[in-house]
Amino acid sequence: MAGYRKLGRPTDQRKAMLRNLVTSFLKHGKIETTETRAKETRSIAEKMITLAKRGDLHARRQVLSFVTEEAVVQRLFEEIAPKYAERNGGYTRIYKVGPRRGDGAEVVILELV
């Protein structure tokens, strides 16, 4: 059994999509996407927040290797991480919205708690 979801894409496209989803999620605090993408994004975003809570230079560089925008990394370390200083994991929440009109895929909202 695989440790991650393939999301029907080649590796490079999947990584690029997840980087963009995580960056958008941390930038806006919530995103609307399909359920499987949200679950995969949630996993990575929680790791990024945990790294940001550490707050040192190495953690910042590790986050920068994945998140595509410097401003988002700044926001993550200065606003988001301090907010969750006392919380051990579980920084995100997934709400089901319903099926998407075009193809019936289950759409959810992924947001910060």
Curated annotation (Swiss-Prot):
InterPro entries recorded: Ribosomal_bL17, Ribosomal_bL17_CS, Ribosomal_bL17_sf
Subunit structure comment from the entry: Part of the 50S ribosomal subunit. Contacts protein L32.
Keyword Ribosomal protein (UniProt): yes
GO biological process, one term: translation
Domain of life: Bacteria
Protein name: Large ribosomal subunit protein bL17
A single MF term (Gene Ontology): structural constituent of ribosome
Family assignment from sequence similarity: Belongs to the bacterial ribosomal protein bL17 family.
NCBIfam families named among the record's database cross-references: L17 (TIGR00059)
Keywords noted in UniProt: Ribonucleoprotein, Ribosomal protein
Gene3D superfamilies named in the record: Ribosomal protein L17 (3.90.1030.10)
Cited HAMAP family: Ribosomal_bL17
GO cellular component: cytosolic large ribosomal subunit
